[in-house]
Amino acid sequence: MLDFLRVTGLFFVTAVAEIVGCYLPWLVLTQGRSAWLLVPAAASLAVFAWLLTLHPSAAGRTYAAYGGVYVVVALLWLWRVDGVVPTRWDLVGGAICLAGMAIIALQPRAAS
């Protein structure tokens, strides 16, 4: 269970790095913010890619499980950064995504 919590925490940090790396260019392109924001955006996406290499499972399984956490972090971003309160539908969808992530992450593993 401790490994599950560690991996979930790593997924959370990975999702934040990805969202920041995409949000900053969005600010530049849609809100007229300084192009200098592209520098930390690129750094954030590089950190995101590096963080993905730290996950213990096969890449495809890691990306599938990570997707559930990403959805929840994006909903938190919607609420805290964009100032939009998630709807009941958003929350139910996020819960379903987390359930899918847990099923993937907690599946029985063959003994090595």
Swiss-Prot record:
TM segment ranges: 9-29, 34-54, 65-85, 91-111
Membrane protein topology class: Multi-pass membrane protein
Protein's UniProt keywords contain Cytoplasm: no
Any Gene Ontology CC annotation: plasma membrane
Name of a matching Pfam family: UPF0060
Location (main, coarse): membrane
Keyword entries, A-Z: Cell inner membrane, Cell membrane, Membrane, Transmembrane, Transmembrane helix
Domain of life: Bacteria
UniProt subcellular location: Cell inner membrane
The UniProt record lists the keyword Cell membrane: yes
Family from the record: Belongs to the UPF0060 family.
Protein name (database record): UPF0060 membrane protein Mpe_A1656
